[in-house]
């Protein structure tokens, strides 16, 4: 296999893990593109992205254009004479002229099994929908949003205890291996391209804080999926006496209840059981305002009065029952 001259474009830690795999591979990373440095921390000092930091550690040229629609930025990229551009969570739109610049085009690492979940939040939407598996797709980029031909897929079962956080970590391990495998196939010309079936496509919209409000009229199983999908952000929550209480972990109880949805049925060290629109949800880890996430057992030691059986919890932040 002849090593490829690769431009890598990415920004967060997830992308940096893929860059490290390329650095460790037979291919040559000739340049890195990443978002401009952003103010961070209390002092609001400019901070380099994880991808930039890794590139500088390895003496790789770094480019940080504000936009790739700029003709000078496009000319700068073209002058690199890359074989291929690898894009992982970059954050900038790549116009067609950029997609067509490298000899073999641009490929993307996408955190789902396409075309099931296109868009910004495929990990979270897969959990919320109750999917039993997810994975990584290596895709040839085109001008659409995650609509390009699929080059390689890897599958990952979704376990009952998975959250968006744990799936992120698993896919961050799986993705780099898939990327290096795909590049080997591309270099050898042995990787067939597969068209996406548009009838199977869904759009994974970015999450919002509003979506994370718990609605007790939903089935317990749906709330359980939401809580896992919104961990670690924006975190499922409900309001009680003007306080936002975040819910980090839960389970679906074997109990049944005819009580009004939102009614606290029991509260002990094993969890807080709440009636829902269908079934009973047991909360096992929560976070009170200004505090860190704690087990229900620890929270009941200090605020048992907030979780008295018979209390009916509101489903929105503007109404208390």
From Swiss-Prot:
It catalyses: L-methionyl-tRNA(fMet) + (6R)-10-formyltetrahydrofolate = N-formyl-L-methionyl-tRNA(fMet) + (6S)-5,6,7,8-tetrahydrofolate + H(+). Keywords: Protein biosynthesis, Transferase. InterPro entries: Fmt, Formyl_trans_C, Formyl_trans_C_sf, Formyl_transf_N, Formyl_transf_N_sf, Formyl_transferase-like_C_sf, GART_AS, Met-tRNA-FMT_C. It comes from Shewanella pealeana (strain ATCC 700345 / ANG-SQ1). This is Methionyl-tRNA formyltransferase. The keyword Signal does not apply. Pfam families: Formyl_trans_C, Formyl_trans_N. The keyword Ribonucleoprotein does not apply. Attaches a formyl group to the free amino group of methionyl-tRNA(fMet). The formyl group appears to play a dual role in the initiator identity of N-formylmethionyl-tRNA by promoting its recognition by IF2 and preventing the misappropriation of this tRNA by the elongation apparatus. It comes from the Bacteria. GO terms for molecular function: methionyl-tRNA formyltransferase activity. Gene3D superfamilies: Formyl transferase, C-terminal domain, Formyl transferase, N-terminal domain. Belongs to the Fmt family. One of its GO terms (cellular component) is cytosol. (6S)-5,6,7,8-tetrahydrofolate binds at residues 112-115. Its EC number is 2.1.2.9.
């Amino acid at each position: 296999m002849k090593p490829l001259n690769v431009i890598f474009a990415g920004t967060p830690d997830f992308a940096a893990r893929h860059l490290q795999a390329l650095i460790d591979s037979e291919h040559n990373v000739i340049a890195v593109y990443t978002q401009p440095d952003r103010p961070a921390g209390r002092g609001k000092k400019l901070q380099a992205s994880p991808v930039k930091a890794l590139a500088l550690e390895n003496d790789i040229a770094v480019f940080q254009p504000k936009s790739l629609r700029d003709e000078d930025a496009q000319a700068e990229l073209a002058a690199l004479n890359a074989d291929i551009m690898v894009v992982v969570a970059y954050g900038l739109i790549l116009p067609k002229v950029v997609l067509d610049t490298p000899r073999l085009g641009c490929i993307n690492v996408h955190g789902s099994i396409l075309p099931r979940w296109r868009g910004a939040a495929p990990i979270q939407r897969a959990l919320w929908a109750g999917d039993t598996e997810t994975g990584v797709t290596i895709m040839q980029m085109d001008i659409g949003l995650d609509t390009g031909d699929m080059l390689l897929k890897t599958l990952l079962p979704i376990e009952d205890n998975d959250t968006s956080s744990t799936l992120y970590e698993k896919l961050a391990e799986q993705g780099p291996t898939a990327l290096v495998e795909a590049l080997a196939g591309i270099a050898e010309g042995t990787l067939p391209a597969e068209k996406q079936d548009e009838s199977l496509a869904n759009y994974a919209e970015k999450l919002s804080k509003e979506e994370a409000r718990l609605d007790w009229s939903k089935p317990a199983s749906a709330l359980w999926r939401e809580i896992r999908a919104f961990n670690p952000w924006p975190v499922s929550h409900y309001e009680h006496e003007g306080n936002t209480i975040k819910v980090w972990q839960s389970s679906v109880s074997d109990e049944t209840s005819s009580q009004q949805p939102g009614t606290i049925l029991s509260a002990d060290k094993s969890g807080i059981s709440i009636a829902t629109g269908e079934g009973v949800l047991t909360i096992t880890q929560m976070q009170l305002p200004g505090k860190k996430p704690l087990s229900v057992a620890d929270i009941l030691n200090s605020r048992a009065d907030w979780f008295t059986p018979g209390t009916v919890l509101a489903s929105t932040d503007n109404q208390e029952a």
